[in-house]
Amino acid sequence: MVVDLKMLAMIFIINFAYITLNTIRFMLTMKGYRVIAPLVSMAEITIYVLGLSMVLNRLDNPLNLLVYALGYAVGISVGIKIEDYLALGYIMVSVILPSTTEQFHLPETLREHGYGVTQSVAYGREGERMVLEILSPRKNERTLYKLINQLEPRAFIISYEPKFISGGFWTKKVRKRNDAISH
């Protein structure tokens, strides 16, 4: 059995590119990017057909299939990293604080850092709690978690991605606040 390194490299690169695009396209679709997702899918399917035909025409070499699978796995990993880097969309973070009196400074500190914070009082098994609702661009997600944990390490944090946002804090003022923070 002759090993064609050029062919193996082409199979890997093609499937790597296909799966990376597939992962990104899927995430764009889930975020509602209705124009760019179909455009990415056109490139994705073209690359897919090319790579698949290369492997199917050379099934006599099991190494081709192995490299195809390796390109698939690496493509998923890289696609996820790219999506994390792009950090499309927003997150909604709910923060439950141990008490309302000790942590009164936390909402104001978060606001000073440019976050929109809605606070309310809730009652848990051990009494009164302060609950914060924070909407943030995903690009700021890790920074927000670090800030909350620095200010209150006992905070209980839950985050999720909202499907629809309308009105409230998220107006043109957000850009102004972000610009002020970064300068």
Curated annotation (Swiss-Prot):
Q: Which GO terms describe its cellular component?
A: plasma membrane
Q: Which UniProt keywords apply?
A: Cell membrane, Membrane, Transmembrane, Transmembrane helix
Q: What is its membrane topology?
A: Multi-pass membrane protein
Q: Which organism is it from?
A: Enterococcus faecalis (strain ATCC 700802 / V583)
Membrane spanning residue stretches: 1-21, 35-55, 62-82
Q: Which family does it belong to?
A: Belongs to the UPF0316 family.
**Where is this gene product found?**
Cell membrane
Q: Which PANTHER family match?
A: UPF0316 PROTEIN YEBE (PTHR40060:SF1)
Instruction: Please verify whether the record's keywords include Transmembrane.
Output: yes
**What is the protein name given in its UniProt record?**
UPF0316 protein EF_1609
InterPro entries for this protein: DUF2179, DUF5698, UPF0316
